[in-house]
């Protein structure tokens, strides 16, 4: 990712950074509109997800997470910006005339060829079942359920590692540090998701954050007691509790938020690291 810096006299453009190489010009048959409803509110209009609202209108890009164009070579034609995710996307032209978007693998450039199927080369951007990959392979866009499409390691810079294969299962180390079992027949894409420097990008001003649909975050300690357990006091006062809490009074640090008795509990060999 090429970061462009502006030399100007205003703080917003002086501190902001822009990616100068990736543009957005999507194909009409691979996009569709989405109804923006709720903005963090439920059917009653009550806020259930804070800090959401506003933002620029978006067109959703149809991403091929299944990679079911088997044994047909495709060529990367464009690398585009996608407003719906922090990773870039690639437009692929397949040999049979099919055109699809996929997640941009790190290091892939325009003109590279990719293919999906069984016993395809272990090459960046190729998709194949885990049973055909050697141990230690870096992968992304990993299926959890066979044929459903990739669901794991899809964010910018995400990469998982195949560390073991035994019986009908493969053992993966995910970007969060979690180690879990997945069926060896599930597919994944070789390589790492591109745009690894997304966390180094500076928005420069608050308005850029609002364009993304994110509203301001206010600290509980500056609120009134009626609004937050940390609120109240004279001047700059501490939170008045032994441990920080959420706005609803639950412990804010260290509390496990994963739902109990999930089917996948037996598949997780090691919890994700904090």
From Swiss-Prot:
Belongs to the universal ribosomal protein uL2 family. InterPro entries: NA-bd_OB-fold, Rib_uL2_dom2, Ribosomal_uL2, Ribosomal_uL2_bac/org-type, Ribosomal_uL2_C, Ribosomal_uL2_CS, Ribosomal_uL2_dom3, Ribosomal_uL2_RNA-bd_dom. Its main location: plastid. The keyword Ribosomal protein applies. This is Large ribosomal subunit protein uL2cz/uL2cy. Residues 1-25, 224-274 are annotated as: Disordered. Residues 7-25 have a biased composition (Polar residues). It comes from Solanum lycopersicum. NCBIfam families: rplB_bact. The gene is rpl2-A. GO terms for molecular function: RNA binding; rRNA binding; structural constituent of ribosome; transferase activity.
């Amino acid at each position: 990712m090429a970061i462009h810096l502006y030399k100007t006299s205003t703080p917003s453009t002086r501190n902001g950074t822009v990616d100068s190489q990736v543009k957005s010009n999507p194909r009409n048959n691979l996009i569709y509109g989405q109804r923006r409803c709720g903005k963090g509110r439920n059917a009653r209009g009550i806020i259930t997800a804070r800090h959401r609202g506003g933002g620029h209108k978006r067109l959703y890009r149809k991403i091929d997470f299944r990679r079911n164009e088997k044994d047909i070579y495709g060529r990367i034609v464009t690398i585009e910006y996608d407003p719906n995710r922090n990773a870039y996307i690639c437009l692929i032209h397949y040999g049979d005339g099919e055109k699809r978007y996929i997640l941009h693998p790190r290091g892939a450039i325009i003109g590279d060829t990719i293919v999906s199927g069984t016993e395809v080369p272990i090459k960046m951007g190729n998709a194949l079942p885990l049973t055909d990959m050697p141990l230690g392979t870096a992968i992304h866009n990993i299926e959890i359920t066979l044929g459903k499409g990739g669901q794991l390691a899809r964010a910018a810079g995400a990469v998982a590692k195949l560390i073991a294969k035994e019986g009908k299962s493969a053992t993966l180390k995910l970007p969060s540090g979690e180690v879990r079992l997945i069926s060896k027949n599930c597919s994944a894409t070789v390589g790492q998701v591109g745009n690894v420097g997304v966390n180094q990008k500076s928005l420069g001003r608050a308005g850029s954050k609002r364009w993304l649909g994110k509203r301001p975050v206010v600290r509980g300690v500056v609120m009134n007691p009626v609004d937050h357990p940390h609120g109240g006091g004279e001047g700059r006062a501490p939170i008045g509790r032994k441990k920080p809490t959420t706005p609803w009074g639950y412990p804010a640090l260290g509390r496990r938020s994963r739902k109990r008795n999930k089917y996948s509990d037996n598949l997780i060999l090691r919890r994700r690291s904090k």
